[in-house]
Structure formats: C-alpha cells, structure tokens
Amino acid sequence: MKNYRLAVDENGSPFVLNSKGSIDFGYITEEMNLSPAPIRVAEGDESYGLAHMVKNHSDQLSQCGFADVPAFVEYVTEHFTTIKEGHTVSYLLEVNEDRNHTLFISLSRTEDYWNVISGGVF
C-alpha cells in the first residue's frame, strides 16, 4: 500500500487524505477545457489549504452541516456543476444550491495537480 503521507505539495506541505485514504479528492478532466489533473488539498498554512480553511471557514462549514473541512472539499470535488475563472490563475468549482458551495483551486507549478487554495459557502 502506498504511503500517501509522504506526498507533499510544491511548498513542502503534506497533502490531506480524503475519506478513502487517497490524496486525490477529485479530478479535472480534458472535457472541462482545463489541464487534466487530480484535485488535492495540502495542510497548508494561513494563506491556503486546510490550515487556511480551518481558521477562516470551519465554523461556517459546520453550520452548513459538514463534519470538517475535508468533508466539504470532498463534497464539492464530487458534485461541482460549474467552473468559473477566478482572479489571476485560479478557478472556482461550485455546487449550485441555495448558496454556492465553492472551492478556489489553482494548477501547481509542475502542472500535475490542482491545489485547493480556499473554499466556503457563499
């Protein structure tokens, strides 16, 4: 079995595991007109990833019924119906409900995965 805990992002931050024990939460495919690659979330820091989302959005996500940040990321990556161009080099993945469940993602410098920057319910 592969030890995913050894995998790190381009900043050296370990990737978070999804509920299935994988670092890949979802995928961007060629049909989406973006670079095809898996979607991953790193532990990060205050500016991106899990640490950023826990600090700035975990209360909101809890109020919307999500057990934790990884559960929210998994939900959006499995159910998004809209992709919008964001600021600079980011894109928004959205599940359109009464309020948008949104993830902000950007392609890694190596272009081999999409990194979750932030997200929330807006």
Predicted feature descriptions by range:
Residues 1-122:
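Ribonuclease/tRNase effector modules and their secretory precursors
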